[in-house]
Regions:
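Amphipathic terminal alpha-helices
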Residues: 269-298
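Glycine-/Pro-rich loop/turn segments that contact NAD(P) or position catalytic residues
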Residues: 87-173
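Substrate-positioning beta->alpha
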Residues: 103, 181-202, 208
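Glycine-rich Rossmann NAD(P)(H)-binding loop
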Residues: 180-185, 210-217, 228-232, 240, ...
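N-terminal Rossmann NAD(P)H-binding glycine-rich loop of SDR-like oxidoreductase domains
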Residues: 5-29, 35
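Glycine/proline-rich active-site loop of Rossmann-fold NAD(P)-dependent oxidoreductases
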Residues: 163-170, 201-210, 233-235
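Terminal hydrophobic/aromatic helix or amphipathic segment near a protein terminus
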Residues: 222-271
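NAD(P)H-binding glycine-rich loop region in Rossmannoid oxidoreductase-like domains
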Residues: 39-43, 48-106, 110-113, 128
């Protein structure tokens, strides 16, 4: 599919987006990226995401995804749109509805009259079990839009990201990890580099929705113990009871709807399983060991 195909990558300054830009280029695509701040493209991204080089992109479109009036011509010549746009950490007081839903809706609206052949969207695994969450509602509203759009579409559903595991290593280095709930829920997070490859396979394949996990299935408690093992310190875990965490969520929600929604997602993730097909190859141990050793590209 890559022969003379142009892909637009939206979310290119985020964790997965940076890996996706590099992967699409390596697979022979012409890569256009959408960003509101071109300088950020060439800086290392959040949570060990790599810096993008000028060789990784063919053209940069500077615009504000939340402002369609700045996006004229964005889809010109584009065959495939890849979007990992969404809130990874709460900033600017924006809601999941405003970012995860509305910004992707803006992209979809631009695609329909422009001849874009396919749209690849990164949602989340297990969404059907947590539809009460604002983040899940926003993601699945985008999925519904794509289903009704008339375009070909593909949905990638990761089972969590290695980027979220770095906090375990940080806590282990400090000598104590804090855990919401008993930590016995199972997960199979995936490295961003591996997930980017899954996204390209999905973009080029026939499977409509793809779940993607890493090679390891473990509990949150086991992952925390692994982090302590990697840093060579005794395991010390403090459990925050679920009732206390839920109380904190309600309090935070009274102060800020935006932060309350994010807190509710974090707490809920501490009590449900997130396991899917093992499509990634990088083990969590290898990632944490490389991260601990100071490898800039773990």
């Amino acid at each position: 599919m890559a022969d003379s195909k142009r892909v637009l990558v939206a979310g290119a300054t985020g964790y997965l987006g940076k890996f996706a830009v590099k992967a699409f280029k390596e697979h022979g695509y012409q890569v256009r990226v959408l960003t509101r701040d071109e300088k950020r493209l060439y800086e290392p991204g959040p949570f060990t995401a790599p810096a993008i080089s000028e060789d990784d992109v063919d053209d940069v479109f500077v615009g504000e995804i939340s402002k369609p009036e700045t996006l004229g011509g964005l889809m010109d010549g584009v065959d495939l749109v890849f979007s990992s746009v969404g809130i990874s950490r709460q900033r600017d007081g924006l809601t999941f509805e405003q970012v995860d839903y509305q910004c992707n809706k803006n992209l979809i609206n631009l695609c329909q009259p422009s001849g874009v052949k396919r749209f690849v969207y990164v949602s989340m695994q297990g969404a059907e079990n947590i539809m009460q969450l604002a983040i899940t509602k926003a993601h699945e509203k985008v999925v519904a839009l794509l289903k009704d759009s008339g375009m070909e579409y593909r949905i990638v559903r990761p089972c969590g990201y290695f980027s979220d595991m770095g906090v375990l290593l940080d806590m282990a280095k400090k000598g104590r990890a804090f855990m919401i709930g008993d930590g016995n829920n199972k997960m199979s997070p995936i490295h961003g580099r591996d997930l980017a490859e899954v996204c390209i396979e999905t973009a080029e394949g026939d499977e409509i929705e793809v779940e993607a996990g890493g090679p390891d299935i473990m509990t949150q408690r086991e992952a925390a113990k692994l982090a302590f093992e990697v840093v060579g310190k005794p395991v010390k875990i403090t459990v925050i009871p679920m009732w206390a965490a839920r109380g904190m969520v309600k309090f935070i929600g009274l102060l800020s709807t935006q932060f309350g929604d994010l807190a509710e997602f974090i707490v809920t993730a501490g009590e449900i399983d997130g396991v899917g097909p093992a499509r990634g190859k990088t083990s969590l141990r290898n990632y944490l060991e490389a991260l601990h050793a100071g490898d800039p590209n773990p």
